[in-house]
Amino acid sequence: MLGAQGVYLGTRFLESSECPVLPAVKEHLAKSATEMDTCVLLRSFKNSTRMYNRAVAKKVLAKEAEKCKFEDIREYVAGSTACKMFFENGDIDGTGVICVGETIGLIDEVVTCEEIINSMMDECLRSIEGIATSN
């Protein structure tokens, strides 16, 4: 059996009930985002990052296509700008960008961290049992 050394779960835990992001942001992502709703920003700066493809991300993509300087997009991609959206105004289309993985489309509800971990463990145990019974 091949195994992973680790997994990146930031997108999943972003949509946990314990995450301090505004509930409206988490609910929007859970109900509206699909795996096709991502784009890669900052490629022209050798810092490729997958983001939720909304209005601000599209502005950044357009500016990058015009060979902009980082200063031209800094305000859009700054963590402080995203914090305003996450914790103050919830304006997904007009404030900052959201770093997510393509798995965003597989998440359709906000649940507790405990439920996320239990679900992963259950899936792991089922996989191990499946391997054991196939030998």
Regions picked out by a protein language model, each given a short descriptive name:
Residues 1-135:
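Conserved active-site-proximal phosphate/metal-binding subdomains
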